[in-house]
Amino acid sequence: LYRKGLQKDGTAPCLLYGYGSYGISIPASFSVSRLSLVDRGFVYAIAHIRGGQERGYRWYTQGRLLNKMNTFTDFIAAGEHLAEAGYTSRGEITAHGGSAGGMLMGAVANLAPSLFKGLIAEVAFVDVLNTILDETLPLTPPEWLEWGNPIEDKDAYEMIASYSPYDNVRRQAYPHIFALAGLTDPRVTYWEPAKWIAKLREFST
């Protein structure tokens, strides 16, 4: 979504939204809240990445369990395409996601920090490995269907460890990050984004 007459010269800022989990589709739809951004020259885009079901059930299965890395590389590819097509440029993209989409934000921050100017991570599920290993948490066992059971499956453990945002923070330059935590959120405990941001403050250069 962008204003008529947009010059595709890479100068426009972009807000790129993504989710990519649980087979949830994010259809293109009208929202008056986006018009304020578009009126100020933004390009607004939604990335239909694997893990969602925008292109059928197989699209979902290719973005869960041992295929989860596809979710993150798809989102990065969407951002790179927008830049290559001139809608925006590298370093002018702000990414937005919440809950499992917040995990997406944390993962792409580690994998491709220079692509993004900023990230908006709402109630972000970023301490994935620690949470999925704790079977005493009431919501953990049902989540094994989506992420795998790292307690019993070595491959699932290694896959989750490879992308869990908190565990993969390293010393590098990160984009600006706005993180929101929900004090009473029943799914994502508030300390996950809190400890993630604390670690980012320590390691970001």
Model segments located where?
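Short beta-strand segments enriched for Tyr within beta-sheet-rich domains
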Residues: 12, 42, 116-117
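Glycine/threonine-rich flexible loop motifs
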Residues: 23-29, 54
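Short amphipathic alpha-helix adjacent to the substrate-entry channel of hydrolases
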Residues: 28-48
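Short beta-strand element of the alpha/beta-hydrolase
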Residues: 9-21
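Active-site-proximal cap/loop segments of hydrolase catalytic domains
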Residues: 46-205
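Short beta-strand-to-loop junctions in surface cap/lid or active-site-entrance loops
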Residues: 1-10, 165-170
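Structural cue for short, hydrophobic secondary-structure segments
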Residues: 17-20, 36, 46, 179
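Short hydrophobic segments within beta-strands
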Residues: 2, 17-18, 96, 180
